[in-house]
Amino acid sequence: MKMIVGLGNIGTRYDETRHNAGFMVVEQLARDFHLGAFTHEKVEAVTVTGLINGQKVMLVKPTTFMNESGRAVKPLMEYYDIALDDLIVVSDDLDMPVGKIKLKQRGASGGHNGLKSLIDHLGTREFNRVKLGIDHPKFGSVVSHVLGRFDTEERPVFEGAVLQAEQALIKWVQGTSFDQLMNEYN
């Protein structure tokens, strides 16, 4: 089974905010493949499991809030015996413009607290990521920016990135190597 973890903050207050880019991608997958509603797991996450083009996949949204995402993901990986190669984490990225996606095999957190939590809890940087650009704030604080919503000009551009990320994830689930996907999407 493959596991796709979307990072974000749980609760209606955070719906559709920039920091919830990961949630938006896994929600799009769940909708498009009619996987049903996310339900509470034994750990601090909501999940939905089903088939994407014949392959078993678990979509995960941690309920720990962004900065503690690893606390939810590690026990799920252990319980379901998910190898690091069968994990992809989807997150936002301040250092990329809205509408851009980047696939990355490993590395540091880049200042992203959700990724930092995953690295700390998993004990490794060796996991695949799909990052969606949310850009730096034009004015105001970074916190206000990441917890804010896309404006009317940015929204359709970001939605295009969500669909592009979804297509990359579908190809990965179907067996395309992550190296090939990086060549195609980066």
UniProtKB/Swiss-Prot annotation:
GO terms for molecular function: peptidyl-tRNA hydrolase activity; tRNA binding. TRNA binds at residues 14, 65, 67, 113. The lineage of its organism: Bacteria, Bacillati, Bacillota, Bacilli, Lactobacillales. It catalyses: an N-acyl-L-alpha-aminoacyl-tRNA + H2O = an N-acyl-L-amino acid + a tRNA + H(+). Belongs to the PTH family. It is an enzyme of class 3 (hydrolase). SUPFAM superfamilies: Peptidyl-tRNA hydrolase-like. The record marks 9 as: Discriminates between blocked and unblocked aminoacyl-tRNA. PANTHER family: PEPTIDYL-TRNA HYDROLASE. One of its GO terms (cellular component) is cytoplasm. Its EC number is 3.1.1.29. CDD domains: PTH (cd00462). It comes from the Bacteria. The record marks 92 as: Stabilizes the basic form of H active site to accept a proton. It is found in: Cytoplasm. It holds the Pfam family Pept_tRNA_hydro. This is Peptidyl-tRNA hydrolase. Monomer. Keywords: Cytoplasm, Hydrolase, RNA-binding, tRNA-binding.
